[in-house]
Design a protein with these regions (language model features):
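N-terminal, positively charged/glycine-rich alpha-helical extensions of SAM-dependent methyltransferases
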Residues: 1-29
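Class I SAM-dependent methyltransferase Rossmann-like catalytic core
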Residues: 22-44, 52
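Class I SAM-dependent methyltransferase SAM/SAH-binding core
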Residues: 62, 70-114
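Conserved glycine-rich SAM-binding loop
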Residues: 67
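A conserved beta-strand element that flanks and buttresses the S-adenosyl-L-methionine
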Residues: 126
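A short, conserved alpha-helix within the catalytic core of class I
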Residues: 134-145
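Conserved beta-strand signature within the Rossmann-like core of class I S-adenosyl-L-methionine
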Residues: 151-159
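C-terminal alpha-helical "lid/dimerization" subdomain adjacent to the S-adenosyl-L-methionine
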Residues: 159-203, 212
Length: 230
């Protein structure tokens, strides 16, 4: 592995601060949705939910770091009776999600810092490509927060830090003509992501046992846990 990928990077992604206006930010989010389609990003989350809930069940799901809401719309298509909440602390993300989601989908989008969400529980808490945005300390706290607020279980889908995806994603992004910030931030996000050993250490720091870790194509590490209240 290249030396620059031996340890997790602390370089910050540009998108949250470098977009000139909402229109550019929304374009980046639309391209990220395209990335998720091309790389089948949401498949592990959807498969996990199918294993734990009937398609017609009226369970609740909270998506942390929901972005444009494409994961929640995918969940809605498969689980028409689910009660869906999307949380993101960036106001432009919430605005873009509301604009991209038809009213008939009935998704509750909330602009908030997740740690400020007190007094609310959900059957399932999910996040997709969110964990690598956090520091190690924040991620430990996030794991503990999920354990406190998920009734039936939680699922983290994130990137796997690997040289092939690190060097390959910019080529894919250029070929697909995705926004420059998406192309550049993609490599940064991969460098900020985790390897199996690091996830084990973070779970231990959080005091969480019984979590399952699985690798998914292409270069995704997913962490799932069924909660004691289920």
């Amino acid at each position: 592995m290249p030396e620059r990928l031996q340890a997790r990077s602390t370089t910050q992604e540009q998108m949250d601060t470098a977009c000139a206006d909402f229109a550019e930010y929304a374009r980046c989010l639309r391209d990220l949705t395209r990335v998720n389609i091309v790389t089948r990003t949401h498949a592990p989350v959807l498969a996990w939910l199918r294993r734990h809930a009937p398609a017609d069940a009226a369970f609740s799901v909270c998506d942390i770091g929901c972005g444009e809401g494409d994961l929640l719309r995918a969940i809605r298509r498969r689980f028409p009776s689910a009660r869906l909440t999307g949380v993101d602390r960036h106001p432009w993300s919430i605005r873009a999600a509301r604009e991209a989601t038809p009213a008939s989908a009935q998704v509750d989008y909330v602009e908030a810092d997740l740690f400020a969400l007190t007094g609310r529980d959900w059957d399932f808490i999910v996040s997709s490509q969110f964990a690598h945005h956090l520091t190690d300390e924040e991620l430990v706290r996030f794991i503990q927060w999920q354990d406190a607020h998920a009734v039936r279980g939680w699922f983290i889908a994130d990137l796997h830090r690997h040289w092939l995806s690190y060097y390959g994603f910019p080529l894919l992004a250029r070929a697909m003509r995705w926004h420059r910030l998406v192309r550049e931030d993609g490599a940064v996000s991969i460098a900020r992501s985790f390897r199996t050993k690091e996830w084990r250490a973070l779970l231990a720091r959080a005091g969480v046992s019984g979590a399952q870790m699985r690798w998914h194509v292409p270069f995704r590490l997913c962490i799932a846990r069924q909660c004691a209240r289920s």
